[in-house]
Amino acid sequence: MTSHTMVKVVGGWALAGGLSISLAAAQNGNSPGVTDNEIRIGNIMPYSGPASAYSSIGRVQEAYFRKINDEGGINGRKPKFISYDDGYSPPKAVEQARKLVENDDVLLIFSPLGTPSNTAIQKYLNSKKVPQLFVATGTAKFGDPKSFPWTMGWQPSFHSEGGIYAKYVLNHHPDGKIAVLCDRLK
């Protein structure tokens, strides 16, 4: 699968799930980030910095929300996708999360990218009861609803992915070599 196809697949599924949740919240119209004609959805993405290669994900998400708006929105409400650059810097991610919650009054934070940035904003968003949905990282700690009920991961854990890749290599390249890459966060 090419990276372009992967972005389209991941973006499409994540947006579909996020919009389903947004639709449910929009039904009552009295949630933060929801008005009679708008649903404000926040996003934090590394448009600059060392992970800027992933910025295409944010652009695809923005384009998809534009498409939804062009087709009439959700129950007459237009999603307003507000996406800020964190440069893949945890302190900047915290600043942008606060801006989205406290100034932009978003309903949720949708698909923020990266383990360091999501780690930095997780406690804040949960303390404010702002959904942190479809976290774009494979670190298993983003699948802990008892400790962080307002956070929901998206992709399989890095541990699970590693097992899948190892089985594939062993089955198809039994003499191959395997290198292990891992993050330092628990």
Language model segments and positions:
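Beta-alpha junction/loop-to-helix N-cap segments that form part of ligand/metal-binding clefts
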Residues: Q27-N30, E38, A53-R59, E71-P145, ...
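Short beta-strand segments enriched in small/hydrophobic residues
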Residues: D36-S56, P112-L113, K177-D183
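Short, surface-exposed acidic/glycine-rich loop or hinge patches that mediate macromolecular interfaces
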Residues: S48, G87, T115, H159, ...
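Short, well-ordered amphipathic alpha-helices
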Residues: Q61-N69
